[in-house]
Amino acid sequence: MEPNVVDHTSMWSLISNASIVVQLVMLTLVAASVTSWIMIFQRGNAMRAAKKALDAFEERFWSGIDLSKLYRQAGSNPDPDSGVEQIFRAGFKEFSRLRQQPGVDPDAVMEGVARAMRVAISREEEKLEASLPFLATVGSTSPYVGLFGTVWGIMNSFRGLATVQQATLATVAPGIAEALIATAIGLFAAIPAVIAYNRFSARSEMLIGRYYTFADEFQAILHRKVHTSDD
């Protein structure tokens, strides 16, 4: 009898004996968990690459290199992971284009540069925040989806008591156990997603803040450059 009890209460047995609704809930949560883990690894690698590229480009930028030379280097060998490089290229390209126009007002040049860099920052912000809405959704909804599966399973367990002459704990325990697995899977999917979302949100805000700081400093350099040459 003991092997039968062990088999009846094993994890796989509980899942396979669950109702179709509970199994669908479990399958949905497992799929959400697997997808969120894939996105967690992808976002983690992307964030590390973006920070590494930012540090490397700022080191080159503040090394005293000529801005035109740096622009040519960035254009000939662009780094797709370097958001700050894209911001620099957008700003300097607009600066060079407007400066070539005869009689253009210096303030109009700087307004164009600021506008171009704001657009570039917005694009980089979208890249950094990719997948974060999905992680937030998984983290906030998975426990409730799991709870729905649990409630449904417990309801089925108690409905099954109507066909039993004598209700005992052994009668309802397997049904309740299989229902609680849905809640466990929901928490397993939600907890990593919430942690990853908070961590990546903080990293994204830090990188975006540094992008804005770089843009302000770069604008200050171009402002001096355009007004000095104008004088």
UniProtKB/Swiss-Prot annotation:
Membrane topology (UniProt): Multi-pass membrane protein
Cellular localization per UniProt: Cell inner membrane
Name of a matching Pfam family: MotA_ExbB
Keyword annotations: Cell cycle, Cell division, Cell inner membrane, Cell membrane, Membrane, Transmembrane, Transmembrane helix
GO CC annotation, single: plasma membrane
Top-level taxon of the source organism: Bacteria
Residues spanning the membrane: 20-40, 134-154, 176-196
Signal peptide positions (record): none
Primary subcellular site in the record, as a coarse category: membrane
InterPro entries according to UniProt: ExbB/TolQ_transport, MotA_ExbB_proton_chnl, Tol-Pal_TolQ
PANTHER family per UniProt: PROTEIN TOLQ, TOL-PAL SYSTEM PROTEIN TOLQ
UniProt cross-references to HAMAP family, sorted A to Z: TolQ
Subunit structure and binding partners: The Tol-Pal system is composed of five core proteins: the inner membrane proteins TolA, TolQ and TolR, the periplasmic protein TolB and the outer membrane protein Pal. They form a network linking the inner and outer membranes and the peptidoglycan layer.
Name of this protein: Tol-Pal system protein TolQ
Native organism: Pseudomonas aeruginosa (strain ATCC 15692 / DSM 22644 / CIP 104116 / JCM 14847 / LMG 12228 / 1C / PRS 101 / PAO1)
Gene name as annotated: tolQ
